[in-house]
A protein has these predicted regions:
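Bacterial N-terminal signal peptides that target proteins for export
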Residues: 2-13
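Residue-level detector of Asp-centered blade-edge/turn motifs that repeat once per structural unit
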Residues: 69-70, 115-117, 180-181, 224-225, ...
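C-terminal motif of bacterial Sec signal peptides marking the signal peptidase cleavage site
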Residues: 23-24
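Short loop/turn segments that connect beta-strands within beta-propeller blades
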Residues: 92-96, 157-161, 201-205, 265-269
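Blade/loop signatures of beta-propeller domains
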Residues: 31-51, 147, 151
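A flexible loop/linker signature enriched in serine peptidases of the S9 family
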Residues: 58-61, 78-88, 103-108, 124-153, ...
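Hydrophobic beta-strand positions that form the internal "hydrophobic ladder"
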Residues: 71-75, 121-122, 185-186, 229, ...
Length: 309
């Protein structure tokens, strides 16, 4: 999934470490008791919703971490060093042991456990198109997100064995997550010529386009009962916005923008806009009962640097 790089952008400030907060793993059926070394000095004064906090990573850039179904592991992307590309890792939360589960080639993003049994993983990678680490984006037009056209979605065994492509179309395919019953995958694809949300079966069959509006649709997650989808979107409206969006898209890039939170039914019907501001709204996720959504936003910071949940 597209994420903000702290070393390449100073407009936004996000956490540079992965933290486990005792808000509970939203998708778990039963609470998982983990033995962790909590460092509650990391909790800022005035934070009333955090009970305990444990820092899990201490070097490099670590992003987009997601819990396994049993709540005992995390899958995430990371690299350590400016010249290296992100690869996918699984961490045992208690022991802090880390295992590389992607191929080590190309660049990767957007990993997720195969629910409901943790018997595999999915992630996006360019290794099938080109095993080399691609060059860093050109920021001469400002800060942009790169949509590497070699990105395809792969499934693999839990330890990364036997990776198999679920997509093979030209252009960007990434930002994939499973429904919690394991019956569907939702992802972002450029196959139609625009960045739209698609769903498919776990074996890659039954691909269905769910959105069809000019702009970026991405970062989607199913509700716990798999009946709803929540995602982030940007739809350019003015002639200038549309021209800028199309120009960058032709170069396999998009610019950070005022992303808004949307929901819809799992079949793509009943689309509803949840936020309506000029801020950046990220990472929407349903509560277990489906009645609330948690997300990250800089709506309360006039400078746009500070994100809160």
């Amino acid at each position: 999934m597209i994420s903000l790089n702290r070393k390449e952008i100073n407009k936004y400030v996000i956490f540079s470490f992965v933290a486990v907060l005792s808000l509970g793993c939203f998708h778990q059926r039963k609470p998982t008791k983990l033995k962790l070394d909590f460092n509650n000095s990391l909790i800022l004064s005035g934070e009333s919703h955090f009970k305990n906090m444990s820092q899990l990573t201490f070097s490099g850039e670590n992003a987009e971490a997601y819990f396994s179904a049993d709540g005992r592991k995390l899958i995430y992307q990371a690299h350590d060093g400016d010249s290296l590309c992100d690869q996918i890792y699984i961490m045992d939360i208690e022991s802090k042991s880390v295992e590389l589960v992607s191929t080590g080639a190309g660049v990767t993003t957007c990993s997720f456990f195969k629910y409901p049994n943790d018997n595999g993983i999915i992630y996006s990678s360019t290794h099938m198109d080109n095993p080399d680490c691609p060059p860093k984006p050109d920021f001469s037009r400002g800060y942009i997100w790169k949509l590497y056209p070699g990105f395809n979605i792969f499934e693999a065994g839990l330890g990364g064995s036997s990776p198999r492509p679920l997509t093979s179309s030209p252009g960007y395919d990434a930002e994939a997550t499973y429904s919690f019953d394991g019956k569907k995958i939702i992802y972002t694809s450029l196959v139609s010529g625009d960045l739209e949300l698609w769903s498919m079966n776990p074996d890659g069959s039954g691909k269905q386009q769910l959105t069809n509006r000019l702009g970026y649709d991405g970062g989607a997650f199913y509700s716990y009962d798999a009946s709803k989808i929540v995602w982030r979107a940007y739809y350019p409206e003015t002639e200038e916005e549309i021209a800028d969006y199309k120009s960058l898209l032709a170069e396999n890039s998009i610019r950070p923008m005022a992303l808004q939170i949307w929901t819809m039914n799992a079949d793509g019907t009943n689309k509803e806009q949840i936020t309506n501001n000029n801020s950046a709204n990220f990472g929407p996720f349903y509560f277990p009962n489906g009645g609330k959504i948690i997300f990250s936003s800089n709506m309360h910071d006039p400078k746009g640097r500070d994100f809160d949940l």
